């Protein structure tokens, strides 16, 4: 199936039905009074996150989604039927934004999460509501309210723990296929990967994390070179980025340091917050470097790149160093997940302490002796 990560749609909620202005007309019941029922409410439009869907392709071609109108009220106190709701199933990770106001309407991060996109109009009132001691036969009734109408932008940001960065042919697809069950297309030409790929890396019976491979970046991607940097949005939810560098390029004129700096520059142009994410340097294709040259080549790269963060030396093709890298990633994610959970618990405990704290001025509380 074709991978689509962006779409624009129009959602139209149903209009409310009109109220009825009817009088009770029945044998042996003179002056029966008003019996007009209310109109039904208009149908709502909802979005629900579904983990079994992984693309927005359904919304690339189906642009308009309408809910049904509510039925009009009728006599004999008959209320109109409410309009049927419409539920749009979207991939987990979809962000829904109002195109006219820029308002963030929904960020679907959990399976089954449901959000209202457009609310149906309220039904009108029948003349039954306007009866009074001075107006026994009212003819007033109200019309139903129109439903909401919105133009929405849908963006899919895949949910992954780890994101892969690198130039085309840096070995990202080979790496993800080596450490997970993902089967991306792998070839010896640039831009083999045209859409994000996800793989689950298992380091134990109940220990795993998700890794995302996106199409490669090149210098000038911010200006649209190559495939641009549109796929970088899929890395915004990750906990750590792996910057893969080809340490043994086939072209002797290619400088790995210059390519690595170009990737960092494009990352910063796209999003400062993404640039500030934890980033690990992964030097790949060491199997192509003679053993007696490896240490010197790695040291030269790190000195010129001026890198003082975590460094891992691997060969995605042979698997050398990949297992140690995966265990380090899992330990890092587990540690920071525990730290984040502890911080949330501390915030909650602090909030409880403040709620239960005595008055700051030391004044008497109700019930204290004067």
Swiss-Prot record:
Pfam families, sorted: GTP1_OBG, MMR_HSR1
Domain Obg as annotated: residue spans: 1-159
Annotated SUPFAM superfamilies: Obg GTP-binding protein N-terminal domain, P-loop containing nucleoside triphosphate hydrolases
Alphabetical list of PROSITE patterns matching this protein: G_OBG, GTP1_OBG, OBG
GO BP of this protein: ribosome biogenesis
Residue positions binding GTP: 166-173, 191-195, 213-216, 284-287, 315-317
Stored CDD domains: Obg (cd01898)
Principal EC category: hydrolase
GO cellular component: cytoplasm
Annotated EC: 3.6.5.-
Gene Ontology molecular function: any one: GTP binding
Domain of life: Bacteria
Major subcellular site: cytoplasm
InterPro entries on file: G_OBG, GTP-bd, GTP-bd_Obg/CgtA, GTP1-OBG_CS, GTP1_OBG_dom, GTP1_OBG_dom_sf, OBG_GTPase, P-loop_NTPase
Location of the protein in the cell: Cytoplasm
Keywords: Cytoplasm, GTP-binding, Hydrolase, Magnesium, Metal-binding, Nucleotide-binding
PANTHER family: DEVELOPMENTALLY REGULATED GTP-BINDING PROTEIN-RELATED, MITOCHONDRIAL RIBOSOME-ASSOCIATED GTPASE 2
Role according to the record: An essential GTPase which binds GTP, GDP and possibly (p)ppGpp with moderate affinity, with high nucleotide exchange rates and a fairly low GTP hydrolysis rate. Plays a role in control of the cell cycle, stress response, ribosome biogenesis and in those bacteria that undergo differentiation, in morphogenesis control.
HAMAP family given in the database record: GTPase_Obg
Family recorded in the similarity comment: Belongs to the TRAFAC class OBG-HflX-like GTPase superfamily. OBG GTPase family.
Quaternary data: Monomer.
Name used for this protein in its record: GTPase Obg
Source species of the chain: Burkholderia ambifaria (strain ATCC BAA-244 / DSM 16087 / CCUG 44356 / LMG 19182 / AMMD) (Burkholderia cepacia (strain AMMD))
Organism classification: Bacteria, Pseudomonadati, Pseudomonadota, Betaproteobacteria, Burkholderiales
């Amino acid at each position: 199936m074709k991978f689509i990560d962006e779409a624009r749609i129009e959602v139209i909620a149903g209009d409310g039905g009109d109220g009825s202005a009817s009088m009770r007309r029945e044998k042996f019941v003179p002056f029966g009074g008003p019996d007009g029922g209310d109109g039904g409410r208009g149908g709502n439009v909802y979005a629900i996150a579904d983990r079994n869907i992984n693309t927005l392709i359904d919304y690339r071609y189906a642009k308009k989604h309408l809910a049904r109108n509510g039925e009009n009220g009728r006599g004999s106190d008959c209320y109109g039927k409410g309009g049927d709701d419409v539920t749009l199933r979207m991939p987990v990770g979809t962000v829904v934004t109002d195109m006219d106001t820029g308002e963030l309407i929904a960020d679907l991060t959990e399976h089954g999460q449901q959000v209202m996109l457009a609310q149906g109009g309220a039904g009108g009132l029948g003349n039954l509501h306007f009866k009074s001691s001075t107006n026994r036969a009212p003819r007033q009734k109200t019309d139903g309210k129109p439903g909401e109408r919105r133009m929405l932008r849908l963006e899919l940001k895949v949910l992954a723990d780890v994101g892969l960065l690198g130039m085309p042919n840096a070995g990202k697809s080979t790496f993800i296929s080596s450490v997970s069950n993902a089967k991306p297309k792998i070839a010896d030409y640039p831009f083999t990967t045209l859409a994000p790929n996800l793989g689950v890396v298992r380091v134990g019976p109940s220990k795993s994390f998700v890794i995302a491979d996106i199409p490669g970046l090149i210098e000038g991607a911010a200006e649209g070179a190559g495939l641009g940097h549109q796929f970088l949005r899929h890395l915004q939810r990750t906990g750590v980025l792996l910057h893969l560098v080809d340490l043994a390029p086939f072209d002797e004129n290619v400088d790995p340091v210059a390519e690595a700096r170009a990737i960092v520059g494009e990352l910063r142009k796209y999003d400062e917050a993404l640039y500030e994410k934890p980033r690990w340097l992964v030097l790949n294709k060491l199997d192509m470097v003679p053993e007696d040259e490896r240490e010197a080549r790695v040291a030269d790269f790190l000195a010129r790149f001026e890198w003082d963060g975590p460094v891992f030396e691997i060969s995605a093709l042979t698997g050398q160093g990949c297992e140690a890298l995966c265990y380090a990633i899992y330990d890092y994610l587990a540690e920071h997940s525990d730290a984040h959970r502890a911080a949330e618990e501390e915030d909650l405990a602090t909030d409880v302490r403040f709620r239960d704290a005595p008055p700051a001025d030391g004044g008497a509380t109700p019930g204290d002796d004067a």
